[in-house]
Amino acid sequence: MPIDSLPPLREVINTYGLQAHKSLGQNFLFDLNLTSKIAHQAGNIEGKPVIEVGPGPGGLTRALLAKGAIVTAIERDERCIPALLEIEKHYPQKLKIICNDALKQDFSKLFEISPEKPRIIANLPYNIGTQLLLNWLLAEPWPPFYESMTLMFQREVAQRITAKPQSAHYGRLSVLTGWRTIAKIAFDVPPQAFIPAPKITSSVVHIIPRTQPLTCSAQKLSFVTKTAFGQRRKMLRQNLKTLGGEVLLEKAGIDETRRAETLEISEFVTLANLVI
C-alpha cells in the first residue's frame, strides 16, 4: 500500500535518470515496508527533527515524512535534488534539503537553536558510513548534538559496531561505539530490497548515546585503539611499543601478553588515560 500519493520510486528514478553510482556508495532502498520499518525503529518521530544522510530519490525520506517527522536531508548527488524537491512540495515546511558532502557538513550547527535534539536516521552510503559514524561517536562536547541514531550498514560493519570482547568482529569500532553509546542490531535487510542489489546483506543498527560514559579523551582513546588493533595477532606489548609498551601495560595492570581483542572497554579507557 502506498504511504503517500507521490509516484512510485521506480517511476521517479526513471523520470530523473537516477541510476545508482557505485563511486558514491549508492544503493537505493525500494521496499516501502522496510523504509517504514526503519522509520518505526527510531521511535515516535511525529513532529520531531530528523537528519537523513544520502536520501537519494527519497524512499526513506517519504517514510519519515509520512510518520510526521521534520526532516533535514543531506544529499551530495545533485541529480537527486529535483526528485527531493518534488517530495518537499508534497510536505511543505517539513523537508529541508541541503546539497553537501556529509563528511564536510557541520551537523551540530544545524540544530544549535532547536529546543530538541535531532535523531539521525539514514541508509548511509556504504563508502562513507563507517567514517560518518566515527565522526559522530567522537563528537565534542558530549552528550552529543543528536538524541539517537538509526543507521543502515553492511552486515559485517554492523557486527563490528556491536561486537563484544573475545569475538571475531571485536575491534576499534566496537570499542569506540560501546564506550559512548549502547548499540544493537535491530534487523537485517536482504540484498533484493535495493536497486542495484548489493552482494551482501545489510543491517539496521539503533544507537543511543550514554549520558555519562567513562571519563576519557576521545582523541586519546581513538589513537590507543587504532594502535592496539593495528596487528590483531600480535601481543599488546608489541602493538603498543610506541606508547610505552610493557611500562604502559604494567601501569594499567594489564598482562603484556594479551591481545587487543581480549580487552574490555574499561581497560582501553585506562590505557588512554595513562598515555601522555
From Swiss-Prot:
Domain of life: Bacteria
The UniProt record lists the keyword NADP: no
Keyword presence, Metal-binding: no
InterPro entries linked: KsgA/Erm, rRNA_Ade_diMease-like_C, rRNA_Ade_Mease_Trfase_CS, rRNA_Ade_methylase_Trfase_N, rRNA_adenine_dimethylase, SAM-dependent_MTases_sf
Pfam families assigned to the protein according to its UniProt record, in alphabetical order: RrnaAD (PF00398)
SMART domains reported for this sequence: rADc
Residues annotated for S-adenosyl-L-methionine binding in this entry: N27, L29, G54, E75, D101, N123
CDD domains reported in the protein's UniProt record: AdoMet_MTases
Single GO molecular function: RNA binding
UniProt GO cellular component terms: cytosol
Keywords assigned by UniProt, alphabetized: Cytoplasm, Methyltransferase, RNA-binding, rRNA processing, S-adenosyl-L-methionine, Transferase
PROSITE patterns: RRNA_A_DIMETH (PS01131), SAM_RNA_A_N6_MT (PS51689)
EC number: 2.1.1.182
Catalytic activity: adenosine(1518)/adenosine(1519) in 16S rRNA + 4 S-adenosyl-L-methionine = N(6)-dimethyladenosine(1518)/N(6)-dimethyladenosine(1519) in 16S rRNA + 4 S-adenosyl-L-homocysteine + 4 H(+)
Stored SUPFAM superfamilies: S-adenosyl-L-methionine-dependent methyltransferases
The protein's role, per its UniProt record: Specifically dimethylates two adjacent adenosines (A1518 and A1519) in the loop of a conserved hairpin near the 3'-end of 16S rRNA in the 30S particle. May play a critical role in biogenesis of 30S subunits.
NCBIfam families: ksgA (TIGR00755)
Name of the molecule in the record: Ribosomal RNA small subunit methyltransferase A
Gene encoding the protein: rsmA
